[in-house]
């Protein structure tokens, strides 16, 4: 037991230090002091290589700053809150392409002019998360009103009439459902219902619907999690149907774990650990080089995506969350061993000790393929969310294992630290 505490404490300290370094990187390099919002196209050293602004990443960074400000005393600092508010105001002014219509741009120019619109719900989802978190830290009702109005629109698009997304219904296209849509909605249900029993009650049916839609992606007699299924929960033909994304399954796993825990459903919790944690990990871990494959084919055929064998930052971040959460809830040492396995690989391969933050894209053998720290798809989100959640879970585990007096002698880092020695 003492050795276990020492290992957990060492990882807690390591994760906390890394969170400080990651936050410092974004504080130093991403803020647009002139136009508002954030730069996310950042090179290895934080230099801006493109000033386009991606709405979903703007929303993610606002959410992340607010969450850190709200949940960690050492991040309760004016510079984080002010940057989050500036990012939120940038979104309020520019995210929606043609107000009062709710559709948000995917890409904006630096000064907020729309460049591209995606026919999906994801910019709108992260807009909603940002507004709700801003309301929680500021008390400004404008933000919550925006969040609730956008949530209503998203639910309408998903469950009633998708025509507002602008996707044509082509006769040859299969009626498919990506796991990403119910995952994202379940995340929003939890976000909006936090500490609000009335709203949580109203949205309970939506949460149940989302969970059931995610669970139907377990196919082939429980032997595979497929990224796409038909609208009635059946396997699709061809590459689309065989497509697997281990990192996405693991992220869905911890979303479902929290759902099961909130409902006190031990049977569902066990099912989720088996099918959404252990199954995608064991099938998705590269036995030769380590790390999680980005994409797989359920029949073992060669995936068509050029990046299928690469190792990306976010699946490993989500795996760390999933397995530490699974261990926290069950005490199963096998889950803790996998957390350590993933965390060691992740810290060794993705972490940049010289400039801070993590590399996002590795070749199959674990060597850095792209030196950028941010871009159209990587911003201030998966890495700090992973580190923040893992720090909290490790603290809670140590509190359960050790006397409070022993923990009180160890304080977390004083604040964000700049790149240097770990």
From Swiss-Prot:
Per the UniProt record, the site (Important for enzyme activity) maps to 380
List the residue ranges forming a coiled coil, or say none.
none
Keyword annotations from UniProtKB, A to Z: Isomerase
Q: Name one process (GO BP) from the record.
A: N-acetylglucosamine metabolic process
What's its catalytic activity?
an N-acyl-D-glucosamine = an N-acyl-D-mannosamine
Which superkingdom is the protein from? Eukaryota
Q: In which pathway does it act?
A: Amino-sugar metabolism; N-acetylneuraminate degradation
Chain spans, region Leucine-zipper: 185-206
* UniProt cross-references to Pfam families, sorted A to Z: GlcNAc_2-epim
Name a GO molecular-function annotation. Answer: peptidase inhibitor activity
EC no.? 5.1.3.8
Family membership, please give it. Answer: Belongs to the N-acylglucosamine 2-epimerase family.
Q: What does this protein do?
A: Catalyzes the interconversion of N-acetylglucosamine to N-acetylmannosamine. Involved in the N-glycolylneuraminic acid (Neu5Gc) degradation pathway.
Q: How does it assemble?
A: Homodimer. Forms a heterodimer with renin and inhibits its activity.
| Record protein name field | N-acylglucosamine 2-epimerase
Q: Which organism is it from?
A: Bos taurus
Task: Please name the gene that encodes this protein.
Answer: RENBP
């Amino acid at each position: 037991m003492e050795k276990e505490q020492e290992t957990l404490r060492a990882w807690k300290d390591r994760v906390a230090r890394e969170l400080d370094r990651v936050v410092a990187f974004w504080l130093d390099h991403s803020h647009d002091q002139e136009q508002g919002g954030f730069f996310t196209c950042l090179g290895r050293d934080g230099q801006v290589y493109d000033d386009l602004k991606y709405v979903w990443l703007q929303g993610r960074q606002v959410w992340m700053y607010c969450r850190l400000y709200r949940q960690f005393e050492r991040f309760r600092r004016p510079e984080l809150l002010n940057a989050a508010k500036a990012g939120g105001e940038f979104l309020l002014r520019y995210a929606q392409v043609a107000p009062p219509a709710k559709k948000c741009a995917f890409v904006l120019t630096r000064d907020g002019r729309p460049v591209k619109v995606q026919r999906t719900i994801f910019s709108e989802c992260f807009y909603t998360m940002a507004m709700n978190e801003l309301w929680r830290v500021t008390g400004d009702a404008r933000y919550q009103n925006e969040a609730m109005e956008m949530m209503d629109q998203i639910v309408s698009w998903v469950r009633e009439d998708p025509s507002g997304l602008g996707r044509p219904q082509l006769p040859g296209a299969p009626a498919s459902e990506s796991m990403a849509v119910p995952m994202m909605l379940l995340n929003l249900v939890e976000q909006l219902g936090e500490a609000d029993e009335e709203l949580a009650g109203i949205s309970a049916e939506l949460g149940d619907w989302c969970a059931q839609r995610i669970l139907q992606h377990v196919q082939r007699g429980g032997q595979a999690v497929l990224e796409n299924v038909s609208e009635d929960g059946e396997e699709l033909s061809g590459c689309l149907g065989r497509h697997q994304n281990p990192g996405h399954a693991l992220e869905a796993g911890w979303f479902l774990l929290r759902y099961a825990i909130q409902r006190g459903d031990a049977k569902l919790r066990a099912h989720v650990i088996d099918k959404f944690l252990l199954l995608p990990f064991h099938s998705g871990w590269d036995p030769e080089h380590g790390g999680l494959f980005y994409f797989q084919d359920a029949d073992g055929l060669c995936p068509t995506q050029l990046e299928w064998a690469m190792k990306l930052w976010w699946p490993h971040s989500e795996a760390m969350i999933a397995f530490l959460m699974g261990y926290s809830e069950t005490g199963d040492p096998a889950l803790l061993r996998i957390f350590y396995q993933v965390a060691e690989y992740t810290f060794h391969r993705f972490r940049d000790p010289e400039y801070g933050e993590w590399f996002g894209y590795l070749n199959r053998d674990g060597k850095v393929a792209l030196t950028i720290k941010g871009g159209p798809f990587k911003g201030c989100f998966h890495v700090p969310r992973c580190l923040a959640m893992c720090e909290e879970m490790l603290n809670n585990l140590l509190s359960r294992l050790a006397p409070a007096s022993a923990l009180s002698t160890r304080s977390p880092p004083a604040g964000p630290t700049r790149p240097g020695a770990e």
